[in-house]
Amino acid sequence: MPRDSKSSFNFQDLMLHRIHEILLVASPYDSFILEEDGRLTQQILYEYLGMNLSYAPRVWHAKNATTGLKMLSDRSYDLVIVMMRIADMDPITFGEKVKAEYPDKPIVLLAFDESEITSLPQERMQKSIDKVFIWSGNANLFPAVIKNFEDKMNFKRDYKIADIRAIILVEDNPRYYSVILPLIYRTALLHARDLISKSLSDTDRLLLFRARPKIILVSTYEEAIKYYDDYRHNILGFISDVRFPKNNELDDHAGIKLAEYIRQKDSDMPIILQSTNPHHNEDATAINASFIHKKSSSLLQELEDFIINNFGFGDFIFRNKRGKEISSASDLKSLKKSLNKIPDKTLEYHASKNHFSNWLAVRGEFSIASIIRPLKVIDFNTLDDLRKLIIEQIDMSLKANNEGRIVQYSSTTKDKSLNFVRLSTGSLGGKARGLAFAINLLSESKIDKKYNNIKLRV
């Protein structure tokens, strides 16, 4: 079972499996295009170092398949990216040779156009290539590919350790997921970067990066159903195509069937369906799902708006029944303040859509999110009872977050409940070290739980 709170695990336990070394097998011309047009190395460094992550992967180039196989035998690589146009071997044969020696090595086939991969033997490709991506000049694709493989490797373990959340993208068309995946990661990481400035401590900053929602890309009905059945309460929502494989055959209504399956157990799970057929809008409405036309000129903007409004990214925006904003919250304190004054109808609307649990989970507040997630409005005699429960959980989390912590002073930390505040940078002095240690001992001992009506503070 997942642990109860973010304080019960070490942030270093998360994201154990990393991609550090990447082998790019590409012709000199393709390598040049990627570096000049896509700024491959520059973009990877920018994305990782810009997020204060010190493990930016290194990219090693091999000009042909023979050189690539030799380099694989000389050192270890975490990910292999092979381009379509390599001189001495087709990419499928290269993938087969790599898989024969290193069966668990992830291999990505990168093409410049979708038409390039239609002539490839599909059955052989499925066994030798883990994923196909289409390069369209978007430099954000490379960090998204890297992070997506890391997420898939780490999700099961991080779920058990820390109750991590996930967003499921169901799409079998490489052209579309090569565009959508970078958008989701950009939204998630920009959100994490924004939260960093509002965090109380260095530990919180690192936790927020490692505890961000995982983005899981699947391409079949069966894969999507398995993730839903196994991790139902930890899924923030689904972004799904309508037409993709089911029972090893393309099904024109697979996305509709997936949404119907989810709705049988979960009436509030955020789902957005995408299709080139605008008539599926009616099908989506019938099962309480949102819809985006894939050929819409505002596809990416509509998708980003859905992600921010339904998956907990950005400030919490309270709205009335007409959709008008009536209040907003950027952290737990302002969320509590707003909860005390919003109308019952607004509370009911957001509670019924899982907005509270998703917003809290994205911020690493897994304990509250896990408590609130399964609750339904009908479980309470009055909406005030629901309001009180959420506020009580927020109070408990605020107290737990502050216990035994040395908090950096800022305009957002002026709170009488804080035990210990650091006014400037540098090491603590002797007296301060002793006081900080005493606070830490009291916090770890949980002595206040042993004796009722007693408050111990330094």
PLM segments and residue spans:
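As written
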Residues: 91, 121-132, 283-291
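Hydrophobic/aromatic residues positioned on beta-strands within the core alpha/beta folds
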Residues: 109-112, 273-274, 294
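Conserved phosphotransfer microenvironments
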Residues: 3-4, 29-42, 54-56, 61-107, ...
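Non-catalytic signal-transmission and effector/linker regions of two-component phosphorelay proteins
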Residues: 1-60, 96, 124-131, 135-214, ...
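N-terminal beta-alpha lobe that positions the nucleotide/phosphoryl donor
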Residues: 336-337, 342-458
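Conserved structured core elements
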Residues: 252, 256, 278, 297, ...
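Nuclease catalytic cores that cleave nucleic-acid phosphodiester bonds
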Residues: 259, 276-287
